Amino acid sequence: MKKTMSAITAAAAVTSCFTGFGAASFSAPAKAAAQTNTLSENTNQSAAELVKNLYNTAYKGEMPQQAQGLTINKSTKGDVHAAFGEPERPVGGDNRFDLYHWNMGQPGYGFSYHKDMTISEIRYFGTGVERQLNLGGVTPEVLQKQLGPVNRVLTVPFTDEIDYVYDTGRYELHFVIGTDQTADHVNLKAK
């Protein structure tokens, strides 16, 4: 009787593995695929929203989020320091930007200045945490879908990066795309 019950139990276990009924099931790959699709949809939606936000604020000569209100050719280095504090890496040597690194889910920024200390260029680095939901989700395809045809495409000297330039009124918005075909950073400057 014991051998019969063991054989029945073993047969049931093997059958359940192949049919999907019982303790063992092959639903894990399906669940992983569904999660991947959801992540991809969230990435595309987040990237699309970021692109639109960057584009819309660029018409005012500004970048979004913490940098909003700091305007190209108007706001000063003092205004930047009042808003962000002292830069983690100040202008100097080969570095022409006051750099503020990303942290705690907040994006990083860089600010370059004219001789009169007004902002000449703002650089947006995005976030380091969940980057695929920020600049890591911005691709040439996302730019085309959200903003339409690019005004100019430039090659960044000494790198393999491509610069997709969109005119935004009196300003230019530069999406610098790396070799992985995602945005490395975004620059805003006056024409």
Swiss-Prot record:
Keywords of the record: Signal
| UniProt cross-references to Pfam families, sorted A to Z | DUF4309
Q: Which residues form a coiled coil?
A: none
Entries under InterPro entries matching the protein: DUF4309 (IPR025453)
Q: Which domain of life is it from?
A: Bacteria
What residue stretch is flagged as signal peptide?
1-23
Does this entry carry the keyword Nucleotide-binding?
no
What is the protein named?
Uncharacterized protein YjgB
Please give the organism. Answer: Bacillus subtilis (strain 168)
